[in-house]
Amino acid sequence: MSGLRPALSTFLFLLLITGGVYPLLTTALGQWWFPWQANGSLIREGDTVRGSALIGQNFTGNGYFHGRPSATAEMPYNPQASGGSNLAVSNPELDKLIAARVAALRAANPDASASVPVELVTASASGLDNNITPQAAAWQIPRVAKARNLSVEQLTQLIAKYSQQPLVNYIGQPVVNIVELNLALDKLDE
């Protein structure tokens, strides 16, 4: 019985620290130092939230750049069901899935001459990826230009404007945020 009091006081102390002080402190510091990121990196137009800069969206029309396929359950880019397809590289189902995606992309992009970029046919580990390479975006330019009646040069400049360079040049590659790029396309129509 003599060991119960120190054990109980240690438990209550750690409960207070890990269940109260630490979460409140990290929330306060996050809101202070990184308010935009701590609140979900939401992209707003006036009072309307159009999306998050961190989570992809299911853009399907010919007038939009398409991102990586989503492997989330129930609906594409479902943040409550984040996860990959869990299909191994050796799984024949993955081969069938990729072949179907390549065929669909070829049909939707008949003017694209180069091979289909790999990130347009493979889902990311989270199933929520919002970035593709500038090359994958450029591959889709003929389709988007035709659907929106824009020039190739306009779309090339837009991709360059929304391309983000890696923090360190030799680690990573440039990426384009598909959500921001497509929202910029919509603004061109206004």
Swiss-Prot record:
Membrane topology recorded in Swiss-Prot or TrEMBL: Single-pass membrane protein
Transmembrane segments: 10-30
UniProt xrefs under Pfam families: KdpC (PF02669)
GO molecular function: ATP binding; P-type potassium transmembrane transporter activity
Alphabetical UniProt keywords: ATP-binding, Cell inner membrane, Cell membrane, Ion transport, Membrane, Nucleotide-binding, Potassium, Potassium transport, Transmembrane, Transmembrane helix, Transport
Origin: domain of life: Bacteria
Subcellular location: Cell inner membrane
InterPro entries given in the database record: KdpC
Protein's UniProt keywords contain Cell inner membrane: yes
Cellular component terms (Gene Ontology): plasma membrane
Family from the record: Belongs to the KdpC family.
Subunit structure: The system is composed of three essential subunits: KdpA, KdpB and KdpC.
Protein function: Part of the high-affinity ATP-driven potassium transport (or Kdp) system, which catalyzes the hydrolysis of ATP coupled with the electrogenic transport of potassium into the cytoplasm. This subunit acts as a catalytic chaperone that increases the ATP-binding affinity of the ATP-hydrolyzing subunit KdpB by the formation of a transient KdpB/KdpC/ATP ternary complex.
Protein name: Potassium-transporting ATPase KdpC subunit
